[in-house]
Regions:
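Bacterial N-terminal signal peptides that target proteins for export
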Residues: 2-13
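N-terminal twin-arginine translocation
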Residues: 6, 21-24
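Bacterial N-terminal signal peptides
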Residues: 11-22
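Compact, glycine-rich, soluble single-domain proteins
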Residues: 28-155
Length: 155
């Protein structure tokens, strides 16, 4: 009798997890590409990125991730220049947010954002993209405002 209750509880938990997974957009569904950073300080760096293409992917972003590998990130791209605003809700790792102009020029970097913060982080100018990297990665790569990002989206 007790074994049956344990099995029933386990089955219920599995079904609950499966049902919840339907509502979470898996990150592997996002397009993955490589972009090139041209830094004045350290030259070129290749970065593997996931590119958000829909409002749902942008809303999900890097939420609930517990690790961000070096030289990888997520690129939030918008077709028209705007003051991009971001936050760290449900994001467990510190990030560097690199705001990029239409021509691929790095406009501004917000380094070491605070995990789980709902403070709004602004590009503070007309930009078309935000590249999120692991916290400290922009400094390790020597990335600064004025450096260039090379990817077909910025052509």
């Amino acid at each position: 009798m007790q074994a049956r209750a344990v099995r029933r509880t386990a089955l219920f938990a599995i079904l609950l997890l499966l049902a919840a997974s339907v509502f979470i957009q898996p990150s592997f569904a996002m397009r993955r590409e490589t972009l090139k950073l041209h830094t004045a300080a350290q030259g070129e760096h290749l970065i593997n990125v996931e590119i958000t293409e829909t409002d749902e992917e942008r809303a999900q972003g890097l939420m609930f991730r517990t690790h961000m590998p070096e030289k990888s990130g997520m690129l939030f791209f918008y077709k028209t220049p705007r003051d991009i605003t971001m936050w760290m809700r449900n994001t467990y790792v510190p990030l560097d947010m690199v705001f990029i102009r239409k021509d691929g020029t790095v406009h501004r970097i917000e380094a070491g954002t605070e995990p789980l913060s709902e403070t709004i982080i602004s590009s503070q100018g007309a930009t078309v993209a935000c590249l999120e990297l692991a916290g400290g990665e922009a400094a390790r790569l020597g990335l600064k405002p004025g450096d260039k990002v090379d990817h077909p989206l910025f052509k």
